[in-house]
Amino acid sequence: MEIIPLPIDRWAGSPVRYPDPAVRILDPRFERYRIDSAAVERIATGYRWAEGPVWFGDHGCLLWSDIPNNRMMRWDERTGAVSVFRSPSNFANGHIRDASGRLVSCEHLTRRVTRTEPDGRITVLADNHDGARLNAPNDVVVSTDGAVWFTDPGYGIMSDYEGDKAEFELPTRVYRLDPDSGVLEPVIDSLERPNGLCFSPHESLLYVVDSGSNATIHVYDMSSGRPTDGRVFVDMRPGTSDGIRCDVDGNLWSAAAGGGDGYDGVHIFAPDGTRIGAIVLPEQCANICFGGRRNNRLFMAAGQSVYSLYTYATGL
C-alpha cells in the first residue's frame, strides 16, 4: 500500500486547485465517483474525538459524538452553524436511524444501546446479556427487518477518557437484537475488537471491522439471516479501520486511522476487495456516513474535526 503524504499547506485554508489531490484514484473503477470540482471541506473543529456521524435529512443536519467531552454535536447544512445537541451524552459513540427515523445510539458510560423517541424519551434497547452487563457498545446498524445489530469491543471501559474504566463482564461480540421478541443474540464472537459494521446492498453481506491487533475487515454471508462463512475481506495494516459504510454499488468506504500522513482518512474498496480510491485527511478518521440532499455527500468524523466531500457515489 503506497502512502503519499499531502503538502502541509493543503490544510492551511487556501483554495484548492481542482481536482483535489486529497481525493485519490487508485483504480479506474473509482473515477466515476470523484467529482473533479469538489474538495474536502473541514466543516467543524475543536473536538477531542469525533465519532458516530449520522445524517438527519428531514432536519437538514448532521449529528455526531464528541466522546471525551461527553456530548453530541449538531451541524446545520443550510447555515453551517454548530451547536450542542445533547450534553451529557453518556459518552455516546456510534449512531444510526431506524426505519421510523428514530436515533439509535451506543453509550459507553451506561454500557447500553438506546433509542431516542420522537418526544425525546430514551428507550433502553439492550444493556445486558444473560444477566451480565454489556462492555461498551460501539457502533450500530439497523437491518430492514428492524433488527438492531451492534458491536461491543469494550473500548469505553478500558480507560476513564471515554467512559468509566471497568472490568469486562462479557466476551467482545457482535449482537443482534430481535425487533419482535427483544431477544439479544450473540452472532459473532471470533473477533478481538469488533468495531464498525454495515450491510451490503440487499443485505446479502455483513461487513465487520476488527480493530484489534489484526486490523482487518471481515465479510460474512447473510443468506441464512445470520452471519456465516466469515473471511478476511481486507487487511488494513499499517493502520486500521473503524467505521464503515457501503454505497449502492456495493463499494465499501472505510474510515482509516493509525497509518500516519498519506494513510489516514477514508479508503474505498470494490466488492472484490481491491482498494480503488482514498480520501486523505490530516487527522485519523474514526467514522463516516453519507448524507446531503442526494445522499452523495460523505461526512467524515476525524480526530478533532468533521470533514465533508461531495461525490458521485450514493450511500445506502
Model-derived segments and spans:
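Blade/loop signatures of beta-propeller domains
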Residues: 2-39
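Short, conserved, GDST-rich strand-edge loop motifs in beta-rich repeat architectures
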Residues: 6-16, 150-169, 257-260, 311
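Beta-propeller domains
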Residues: 32, 57-87
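Beta-rich, blade/repeat-based domains predominating
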Residues: 39, 45-60, 88-107, 112, ...
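A short beta-strand motif characteristic of beta-propeller blades
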Residues: 40-44, 80-86, 123-130, 182-189, ...
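A short loop-to-beta-strand structural motif that recurs across blades of beta-propeller domains
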Residues: 71-73, 112-114, 172-175, 216-218, ...
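Short loop/turn segments that connect beta-strands within beta-propeller blades
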Residues: 76-80, 117-121, 178-182, 221-226, ...
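Loop/turn-rich, solvent-exposed surfaces of beta-rich toroidal or solenoidal domains
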Residues: 207, 214-274
